[in-house]
């Protein structure tokens, strides 16, 4: 276990920093930067590990916002040596995929643009339009993010007309098929009329359409149709003929961009300002534009000249190699173009060319993509300007010495003291940073059904949130040295950073109890505090018994209201979830012989009590820790 000193950033411990740097070899490989909780926050590669890692700690890098932000959190550096640079690139790609380090995730999780998800983690995969990746579903495959959601929905609609697909997450009926099966829209997934292996074969065909391999799929289907005809399986042959007809209709809906149907290429271009970068990627397959993808990157987190290379590494490392095109056109030169080309070629199994065209039709195509990126950046900048104005007005309203980049909001939720929980929501640069949100289960045993105490709950909440910083201060650490004054919306959630402002949902009483908690931690002078009462939307600050005066349309007040409402929503949602889970478990605990561990296993396996009630005996028996005898016992209980 590390000591408190070992948890300090290396830049604050010169002796440990020198020892760390001296032990890094002058060889190709990957380096892993970790924070004080052993979380990997950055993975890099280099042909000379020693030289590359040392470069982060040179004075001239102080002007690099991304590096200065990251180095405030690096407490440990590990390394892995490889034989050459290409091997280091492959290793880096695999490590990033498995660890998802914060500072390697260049592309923002922008929920404005949807993905198409194929749930390969399930026995019978579904095809969904989603705006965030599913948890605990590593085998799922994502395509996107797509700019044109209407076109995406139309594509999915046409695909479902060509191939019968699973329509529901759970069965509608327990012992009979639904209307979707009767009209041929579903192959009978719920009742397992089609086997998992046969259904997954259908999904693989659908995936070929999404990947732009429609011509290849047509050839496979034509060959299969001829085989069925020879074997006199005319009904099966007719099904394939109808699918081919549907594919021809689908192909006609795609925009032709190149007269040559053999052209498979991606065109990538970008536009940047000081805070954000917009990247557009056009996918052209068989001479047709099959998709227009859009990404947003944080300009602070990488050098603008390297941004396209980072996009290529991050985007293509997540793809099925068969999707990688033969040619990639860029708007800018990248540093390691030969190594990247070799890496992509090795992944694909055939040559991948990367070009930066200056004249000809290819250059015109790159210019078109760049115009789209510039338009998207303009839209993005307007949102940033609005958020900055709100922060400036809030700083003036609360008499803060600087704009509050990171603001935390806290709220409590319970019903007469039962299932009491707390929420922490975080706004960075005026925008929700949802991966920083935290949920708290109130542990004080005096708070229970019939005895609620919001003040005691807030006191516990604030104490638990800031106790680590109190320990640092007791140790003599200068908090201003490790405080993150350049908070970014993409800061890692493991960064226990001081907020520039803390807002409590409530009035003077709630504010005073939060202040007492900070005084107990010796942090009341370090953290700015306010509260926002629902009645009259009054703002209170320490040392002032009367609410601050401001207009109802003040941008600073509107920002605090959004934060307050979000903290309330997050707390109430968590409380309802805990209460519902308690009710679920109460129903299951009525079954004799079922303990807490088996209840948890059943709920994790089926997701709901309703699904358990509808399950067959053999399905219940497939849950972890549940055998045939217990499964029959459970089934009999629900089917008396």
Curated annotation (Swiss-Prot):
The keyword DNA repair applies. It is found in: Cytoplasm. SMART domains: GIYc, HhH1. The keyword Nucleus does not apply. One of its GO terms (molecular function) is DNA binding. Keywords: Cytoplasm, DNA damage, DNA excision, DNA repair, Excision nuclease, SOS response. It holds the Pfam family HHH_5. Residues 215-250 form the UVR domain. InterPro entries: GIY-YIG_endonuc, GIY-YIG_endonuc_sf, GIY-YIG_UvrC_Cho, Hlx-hairpin-Hlx_DNA-bd_motif, RuvA_2-like, UVR_dom, UVR_dom_sf, UvrABC_protein_C. GO terms for cellular component: cytoplasm; excinuclease repair complex. Residues 26-105 form the GIY-YIG domain. Interacts with UvrB in an incision complex. Belongs to the UvrC family. This is UvrABC system protein C. It comes from Prochlorococcus marinus (strain SARG / CCMP1375 / SS120).
């Amino acid at each position: 276990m590390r000591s408190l000193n070992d948890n300090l950033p290396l830049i604050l411990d010169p002796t440990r920093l020198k020892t760390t740097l001296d032990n890094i070899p002058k060889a190709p490989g990957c380096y892993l930067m970790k924070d004080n909780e052993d979380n990997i926050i950055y993975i890099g590669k280099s042909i000379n590990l020693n030289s590359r890692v040392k470069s982060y700690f040179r004075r001239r890098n102080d002007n690099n916002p991304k590096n200065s932000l990251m180095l405030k959190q690096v407490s440990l550096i590990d390394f892995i040596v490889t034989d050459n640079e290409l091997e280091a690139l492959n290793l880096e790609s695999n490590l990033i995929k498995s660890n998802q380090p914060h500072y390697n995730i260049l592309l923002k999780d922008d929920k404005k643009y949807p993905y198409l998800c194929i749930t390969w983690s399930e026995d019978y995969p579904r095809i969904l339009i989603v705006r965030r990746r599913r948890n605990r579903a590593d085998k799922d495959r994502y395509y996107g993010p797509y700019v044109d959601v209407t076109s995406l929905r139309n594509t999915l609609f046409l695909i479902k007309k060509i191939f019968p697909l699973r329509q529901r997450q759970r069965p509608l009926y327990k012992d009979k098929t639904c209307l979707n099966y009767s009209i041929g829209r579903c192959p009978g997934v719920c009742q397992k009329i089609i086997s998992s292996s046969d259904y997954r074969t259908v999904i693989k065909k659908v995936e070929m359409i999404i990947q732009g391999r429609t011509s290849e799929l047509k050839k496979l289907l034509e060959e299969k149709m001829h085989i069925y005809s020879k074997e006199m399986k005319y009904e099966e042959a007719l099904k394939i003929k109808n699918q081919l007809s549907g594919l021809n209709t689908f192909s006609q809906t795609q925009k032709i961009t190149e007269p040559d149907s053999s052209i498979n290429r991606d065109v990538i271009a970008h536009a940047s300002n000081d805070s954000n970068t917009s990247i557009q990627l056009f996918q052209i397959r068989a001479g047709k534009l099959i998709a227009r993808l859009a990404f947003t990157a944080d300009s602070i987190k990488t050098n603008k000249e390297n941004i396209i290379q980072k996009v290529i590494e991050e985007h293509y490392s997540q793809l099925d190699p068969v999707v990688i095109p033969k040619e990639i056109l860029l708007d800018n030169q990248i540093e390691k173009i030969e190594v990247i080309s070799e890496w992509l070629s090795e992944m694909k199994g055939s040559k991948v060319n990367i070009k930066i065209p200056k004249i000809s039709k290819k250059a015109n195509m790159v210019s078109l993509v760049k115009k789209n990126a510039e338009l998207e950046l303009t839209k993005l900048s307007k949102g940033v300007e609005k958020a900055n104005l709100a922060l400036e007005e809030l700083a003036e309203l609360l008499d803060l010495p600087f704009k509050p980049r990171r603001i935390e909001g806290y709220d409590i939720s319970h019903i007469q003291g039962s299932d009491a929980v707390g929420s922490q929501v975080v706004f960075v640069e005026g925008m929700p940073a949802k991966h920083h949100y935290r949920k708290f289960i109130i542990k004080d045993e005096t708070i229970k059904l019939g005895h609620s105490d919001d003040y005691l709950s807030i006191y516990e909440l604030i104490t638990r949130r800031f106790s680590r910083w109190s320990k640092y201060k007791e140790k003599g650490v200068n908090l201003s040295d490790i405080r993150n004054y350049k908070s970014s919306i993409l800061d890692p959630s493991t960064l226990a950073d001081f907020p520039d402002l803390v807002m409590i949902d409530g009035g003077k009483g709630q504010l005073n109890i939060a202040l007492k908690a900070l005084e107990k931690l010796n942090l009341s002078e370090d953290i700015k505090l306010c509260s926002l009462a629902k009645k009259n939307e009054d703002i209170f600050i320490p040392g002032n018994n009367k609410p601050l005066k401001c207009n109802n349309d003040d941008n600073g007040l509107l920002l605090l209201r959004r934060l307050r409402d979000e903290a309330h929503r997050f707390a109430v949602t968590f409380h309802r979830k805990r209460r519902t889970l308690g009710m679920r478990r109460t129903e299951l605990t009525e079954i004799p012989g079922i303990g807490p561990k088996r209840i948890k296993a059943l709920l994790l396996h089926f997701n709901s009590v309703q699904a358990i009630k509808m399950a067959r005996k053999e399905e219940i028996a497939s849950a972890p820790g549940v055998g045939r005898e217990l499964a029959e016992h459970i089934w009999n209980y629900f089917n008396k």
